[in-house]
């Protein structure tokens, strides 16, 4: 596996290939990232991953400075998974000057849920993803990029951006990888204390219970069910931002009977100092 730190080096390594399969990450890799690499690899003629902790998607009070940087261990895992090129740029390489041109997702998708509780988050995500796509796919007739469904809203934001800009990139949404107790794998799980790690599995259980309740009748009172789910988590010591049932296609609240509507239950809540997100399609 080649490890490159500059855009010029990256493009040189990718020059012989026509269809990169790309997995962008912020590092501190877990089995979910590795599963994405393995899923994407057969869909391209070269497999690329990136590790870059993107300052633009962190608010001033968030964990940019403390986010784990584990490049050597990550590189070993990527190589073992069959990655051919790892792009690990320094901040000055991707942002040699202040990034004044930014991608602002449409408010109906970018300003709800995660976008509401983390203002500017999807602006930072969309901007860095488009920039990474430019680095990886420049001059290529097609490509594939893999993202995990754990970040469900992010997948929709990126997919819509690709459609809006007519980019020749297929977006692969990989299934969420989970621990044996149901906790969605996340780089931020490493922040949890031993007791918090045990409790953290309750988030996926709360989402499943909410989903089951929503599907129990054709016309449920979703607002009441969502409020009850949040109260139940709060009683366990969590600080929930949202637990909600939405349409899969656009993350808007469902209208009318739910029987035929493809839905997803999404949640975000803070346990101690760690904010966790998860979702379940129902």
Curated annotation (Swiss-Prot):
InterPro entries per the UniProt record, alphabetical: Pantoate_ligase, Pantoate_ligase_C, Rossmann-like_a/b/a_fold
Residues that, per the record, bind ATP: 26-33, 148-151, 185-188
Subcellular compartments: Cytoplasm
Gene Ontology terms for molecular function: ATP binding; pantoate-beta-alanine ligase activity
Coiled coil regions, renumbered to chain: none
Gene3D superfamilies tied to this protein: HUPs, Pantoate-beta-alanine ligase, C-terminal domain
Binding-site residues for (R)-pantoate, renumbered to this chain: 57, 154
More info: The reaction proceeds by a bi uni uni bi ping pong mechanism.
Stored PANTHER family: CYTIDYLATE KINASE/PANTOATE-BETA-ALANINE LIGASE, PANTOATE--BETA-ALANINE LIGASE
Stated name of the protein: Pantothenate synthetase
Phylogenetic placement of the source organism: Bacteria, Pseudomonadati, Pseudomonadota, Betaproteobacteria, Burkholderiales
Gene: panC
């Amino acid at each position: 596996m080649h490890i490159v730190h500059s855009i010029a080096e990256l493009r040189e390594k990718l020059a012989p290939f026509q269809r990169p399969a790309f997995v962008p990450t912020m590092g501190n890799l877990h089995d979910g990232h590795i599963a994405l690499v393995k899923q994407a690899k057969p869909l391209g003629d070269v497999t690329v991953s990136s590790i870059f902790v993107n300052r633009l998607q962190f608010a001033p009070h968030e964990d940019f400075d403390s986010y784990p940087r584990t490049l050597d261990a990550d590189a070993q895992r990527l190589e073992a998974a069959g990655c051919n090129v790892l792009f690990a740029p320094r901040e000055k390489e991707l942002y040699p000057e202040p990034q004044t041109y930014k991608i602002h997702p449409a408010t109906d998708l970018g300003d709800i849920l995660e976008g509401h509780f983390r203002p500017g988050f999807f602006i930072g995500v969309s901007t860095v993803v488009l920039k990474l796509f430019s680095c990886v796919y420049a001059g290529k007739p097609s490509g594939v990029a893999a993202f995990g469904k754990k970040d469900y809203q992010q997948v929709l934001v990126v997919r819509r951006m690709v459609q809006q800009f007519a980019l020749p990139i297929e977006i692969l949404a990989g299934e969420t990888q989970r621990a044996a107790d149901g906790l969605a794998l996340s780089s931020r799980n490493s922040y949890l204390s031993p007791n918090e790690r045990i409790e953290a599995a309750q988030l996926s259980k709360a989402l499943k219970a909410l989903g089951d309740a929503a599907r129990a009748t054709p016309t449920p009172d979703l607002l009441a069910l969502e409020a009850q789910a949040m109260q139940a988590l709060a009683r366990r010591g969590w600080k929930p931002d949202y637990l909600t049932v939405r349409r899969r296609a656009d993350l808007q609240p469902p209208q009318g009977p739910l029987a035929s509507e493809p839905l997803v239950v999404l949640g975000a809540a803070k346990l101690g100092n760690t904010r966790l997100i998860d979702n379940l399609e129902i």
